[in-house]
């Protein structure tokens, strides 16, 4: 048998993450370390991660979100904060419904099984969620409150119903949200989508446009790029509001001009595919294709008489109308040339027939106003798997809210998903009801609320675990606002926008007190495989389970954290994990060797050879400086959410400890004071490691004779949040 390498401990146990990681996960669970309840006098830290769609196994694209959130939670807990960190599972929505159709099972069963499997993977990844607060969004106790908030919006006039074009997939036979249409094709089956007109439910987000715009200046913890996108999305514009009559129609045409100087050159009006005039054309069986020149003509006042403006349905989403000029570059010129709309020619045969601002103001066709690009939020879909819209349609009373005592309106389970279309429309027991107002025969609304319909879900996380009401003010105010929200940058125009809007609506309706619910936002870049976004539908997802089985959860966590800055994309490669596994192996061997050396010095001391005491020499002082500087840098990086830099500083500190160890051993035999300094520094290094690689940190802490759990320990040194409650609860690092 060969002798051990000089850099290896003689009696170090083998590093077997598959065996040790579940053991420490059980220890954390048994100690209830991650249960969070309000503690007066102790600073709080509330972390919210965007929940995964529960349609299968977790992959690397999911893991980045949750590993970074967990690392932040562990750091803040060690800093003395009372940390609330939990999760949920987005078990409603079209992906789950279609997957259930393909599997031939009920969506409820698929959602439950997938979320349970994901929860087990969260544990295996070492995530420290408060398990008491985890929920599945398809549970009636949860979606009762989704319906309750919808009704409050409806009663306050923030929610309304109107006809609108929607994307339709003929293969999947469902309506699609804009986020599920990729380059004109269904995200799942890749079939070209068409457009149909249906009654739709909308939320008036524009009501809150100015408030949301003004509030952006207070969001110091939000990325500048996200705030810029929100400003552009709201699109506040000071210009003209035009109300033009349309020949032969009772209702006119409303549009906005950013600049009154644009008006004289206007020769046509272009409308999006969801505009009511476009909807009328679609209802007559005309598909938009590229563009359509309607028979309808808008009329505007001019200095020399009325000006007729042709109306074109352009190949653009939304329901906006805009004024077009043939002499403009780009889309306007192309539309004008395609439909032979000439530019005005002033001077030929007298005054040209052009729009005139003074004449239009006098005729009541123009008004100086502030307008917005922001459109109403389509919040419901004509499909089965979602919270039913809690409205009853009565011939006499119109749309009537379901009484609060009758909530939740439950989804029927005995539906036939093999039948085309929305099964709720054909389910007589669900559909046919009495009007809550007059008692006449009526029909339930057959639409269901979309996946983003509860952008207040953080209220559910911070309620007491023994109550049902997520809008108890005392519970909410104990934790809100959210200190850190983490999610993909692809949610900038959806979740991250709706979360700000709904907070203002809740405050305005007297339900909640905060208007900016998120103090700091971390918008993550994508995880890619071969330069394509990693996803199950793209067929390039890397299995989380297989990586953990091969390398261990800690190596995977380190690879995710160290791959790039959170806001940057990551092109995934297994080499990232292999390198971190090698790093863990070096650290494992080093710590066990330090433990052996310290034990040897202690044994010699017990045998009557006491170590000599003295002032630290230059080498020892340098080690102490490295340790203090490294700890400060790691903590500062964490506070800035530069987790990748924190890991680099941890690795750099490890190199300094190795350098000290090598210098110490050159002064053979090792001096007791050198060993004491090295052992103390190594203990601190292991504590610093805790947020990154919590399982191996616990194992190494135990090898060094540390008391308690790293997950419950204080951050080394003075760099800790101080409070009477925190100090009383935690051991000081000596």
Over which residues does each language-model region extend?
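Short hydrophobic alpha-helical runs that function as membrane-insertion/retention elements
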Residues: 84, 342-347
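Short, glycine/acidic-rich hinge or "gate" loops at secondary-structure transitions
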Residues: 131, 510-521, 595-616, 664-670, ...
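C-terminal low-complexity, glycine/proline- and small-hydrophobic-enriched intrinsically disordered tails
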Residues: 574, 578, 641-644, 648, ...
